[in-house]
Curated annotation (Swiss-Prot):
Its EC number is 1.1.1.27. Belongs to the LDH/MDH superfamily. LDH family. The gene is LDHA. Predominantly expressed in anaerobic tissues such as skeletal muscle and liver. ISGylated. Pathway: Fermentation; pyruvate fermentation to lactate; (S)-lactate from pyruvate: step 1/1. The modification N6-acetyllysine is found at K5, K14, K57, K81, K118, K126, K224, K232, K243, K318. One of its GO terms (cellular component) is oxidoreductase complex. GO terms for biological process: glucose catabolic process to lactate via pyruvate; glycolytic process; lactate metabolic process; pyruvate catabolic process; pyruvate metabolic process; substantia nigra development. This is L-lactate dehydrogenase A chain. The keyword Ion transport does not apply. It is linked to Glycogen storage disease 11: A metabolic disorder that results in exertional myoglobinuria, pain, cramps and easy fatigue. Substrate binds at R106, N138, R169, T248.
Length: 332
C-alpha cells in the first residue's frame, strides 16, 4: 500500500545529507539563544546545531525555533547533549561557561571556565576538525587563548568576539551625540574586551572627517565636551544592563551574527576581534587582544596595522601583561 507521501511525491535520487554551511552554538543561555536567532534571521546557515548540558532546556529551545521554520530559511535545526550533532560545522560559536559568583575572583572564574572548555573544545575538534572557533564566553580574551591551546588549531581559526561589541556600543553613543546613524560613525575600541579597553580617538571620523582634527582635545581630560565619557559609558553599559535585566544578550547576539556573516560569506570585512597579538605593539607573550582583523572563510586572514599613540600602546601592553599574569597560572 503506497503511503500518502509516495502518492504525492516521486523521488528522483537519494541525496547525501551533508550540510554545506553548518553553524553550531554551544550553550543555550540568553547569549547563545540571542546568537542563534540573530544567525537564523540573517539566513547564514543551512543547518543550525545547539548543544548544552541541560537537556530539557536544550530540547525546548530547539523546538521553539523549529516551530518558527515557516518564517526562516534554515531548513534544519538540531540539538543534543552529544557533540555528534555538531559534525561538519563550518563555524562553532562557544557561549557556554560558568557565571561569576558574587565575590568570586576573576582568576577563579577563569579556572572554572578552563575546566568547562577542557570538555567542550576536544569534542568540537573531534567532529569538526576544519571549523572556525568563535569564542564569546567571558573573560573572552583569556578563553580564546585557552581554546587555541586546547584545540591545536592555527591561530587564524580561533577568534574571540572581543571588542566587536565594545566598538558597536562606542559607535552607537557617538551617533547619539552627533545625530548620525552608527554605520556612518567610525571609531574603534581595541585591546581587552571590557574594563581596560582602549578607544582610538585619532581614528574617530564621520565621512572621513577626523573628529580629533576638528577638536584636538577629544578624549583628553581638557575636553570641555567630555568625549571621554563616551568610552566610560561603553565600559559601564554592560554592568548597567546586567543590573537592570540580569544579563546582556541582544547586542552580543547581533554582534556575533555580524562576525558569523563575514566568515560564512567570506566578506573580508574588518572587525575588532580578539586574535593572537604576540609580536605587535611590543607584546612578547601569547596573548589574545582585539585589533582590526580581516574576517573571511579562513577566519582571520590579515590584521590592519593601526597607528597608536604611545599612551594607547602602553595601555595595550598593560592589558597584555595583566592577561599573561592570569594565563600563566592556569591549569590545563
Amino acid at each position: 500500500m503506497a503511503t500518502l507521501k509516495d502518492q504525492l511525491i516521486y523521488n528522483l535520487l537519494k541525496e547525501e545529507q551533508t550540510p554545506q554551511n553548518k553553524i553550531t552554538v554551544v550553550g543555550v543561555g540568553a547569549v547563545g539563544m540571542a546568537c542563534a536567532i540573530s544567525i537564523l534571521m540573517k539566513d547564514l546557515a543551512d543547518e543550525l546545531a545547539l548543544v548544552d548540558v541541560i537537556e530539557d532546556k536544550l530540547k525546548g529551545e530547539m523546538m521553539d525555533l523549529q516551530h518558527g521554520s515557516l518564517f526562516l530559511r534554515t531548513p534544519k535545526i538540531v540539538s543534543g547533549k552529544d557533540y555528534n550533532v555538531t559534525a561538519n560545522s563550518k563555524l562553532v560559536i562557544i557561549t557556554a561557561g560558568a557565571r561569576q559568583q558574587e565575590g568570586e575572583s576573576r582568576l577563579n572564574l577563569v579556572q572554572r571556565n578552563v575546566n568547562i572548555f577542557k570538555f567542550i573544545i576536544p569534542n568540537v575538534v573531534k567532529y569538526s576538525p576544519n571549523c572556525k572557533l568563535l569564542i564569546v564566553s567571558n573573560p573572552v580574551d583569556i578563553l580564546t587563548y585557552v581554546a587555541w591551546k586546547i584545540s591545536g588549531f592555527p591561530k587564524n581559526r580561533v577568534i574571540g568576539s572581543g571588542c566587536n561589541l565594545d566598538s558597536a556600543r562606542f559607535r552607537y553613543l557617538m551617533g547619539e551625540r552627533l545625530g548620525v546613524h552608527p554605520l556612518s560613525c567610525h571609531g574603534w575600541v581595541l585591546g581587552e574586551h571590557g574594563d581596560s579597553s582602549v578607544p582610538v580617538w585619532s581614528g574617530m571620523n564621520v565621512a572621513g572627517v577626523s573628529l580629533k582634527t576638528l577638536h584636538p582635545d577629544l578624549g583628553t581630560d581638557k575636553d570641555k565636551e567630555q568625549w571621554k565619557e563616551v568610552h566610560k559609558q561603553v565600559v559601564e553599559s554592560a554592568y548597567e544592563v546586567i543590573k537592570l535585566k540580569g544579563y546582556t544578550s541582544w547586542a552580543i547576539g547581533l554582534s556575533v551574527a555580524d562576525l558569523a556573516e563575514s566568515i560564512m560569506k567570506n566578506l573580508r570585512r574588518v572587525h575588532p576581534v580578539s586574535t593572537m597579538i604576540k609580536g605587535l605593539y611590543g607584546i612578547k607573550d601569547d596573548v589574545f587582544l582585539s585589533v582590526p582583523c580581516i574576517l573571511g572563510q579562513n577566519g582571520i586572514s590579515d590584521l590592519v596595522k593601526v597607528t597608536l599613540t604611545s599612551e594607547e600602546e602602553a595601555r595595550l601592553k598593560k592589558s597584555a601583561d595583566t592577561l599573561w599574569g592570569i594565563q600563566k597560572e592556569l591549569q590545563f
